[in-house]
Regions:
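Acetyl-CoA-dependent GNAT
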Residues: 3-9, 14-96, 104-109, 113, ...
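Short amphipathic helical patch at the helix-1/turn junction of helix-turn-helix
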Residues: 93, 126-127
Length: 165
């Protein structure tokens, strides 16, 4: 586990595209997934990682020259979230590595790092993505009643967990 740097932008962009296509094949319209361009994703990630806000973190898991998964975290921008809440904005794993425990390890690290700075940690996922719901529930995150329409035409739900005392 390590903090991502600008040199990881290309690998994260390519992984994000593969992960979305695998994870959301039954959730999002095919044209949405087909429109994802790994080159554009890589450029966006390079830009973001080159000027990473001090409040944000991007964690990667894998050997030094590879990215098997990544998690992006930062403050939770939701007006209805508890004041000062943190959020895991994204968690993606190489599709072939799902079920190996790497996702749990990566998510646990990202959530624990957020809990150093935030009393409550939130995560959003597509409501139709039952696997994600079970994953977050096993990690102690419960539905908190918040939902919203996504820009992709499907509903997202929020889960949250309060830092242990």
């Amino acid at each position: 586990m390590r903090a991502a740097g600008p040199g990881d932008g290309r690998a994260i962009g390519a992984l994000a595209t593969r992960a979305w296509r695998a994870a959301y094949a039954r959730v999002l319209a095919p044209d949405v997934l087909d429109s994802m361009d790994p080159i554009e994703q890589a450029a966006d990630w390079l830009t973001y990682l080159s000027d990473l806000p001090a409040t944000d973190r991007v964690w990667v898991i894998g050997p030094p020259v590879e990215v098997w998964g990544f998690a992006r975290t930062g403050p939770c921008p939701d007006a209805d979230a508890p004041a000062g809440a943190g959020e895991v904005h994204g968690l993606y794993l190489e599709p072939a590595r799902i079920g190996t425990g790497l996702g749990r390890e990566l998510f646990a690290h990202a959530a624990a790092d957020l809990e150093i700075r935030h009393e409550v940690v939130c995560v959003w996922h597509f409501a139709a993505n039952d696997g994600a719901g079970r994953f977050y529930e096993r990690a102690g995150f419960a539905l908190d009643g918040a939902s919203r329409p996504s820009s992709f035409g499907v509903v997202e739900v929020r889960r949250s967990r309060r830092r242990a005392a």
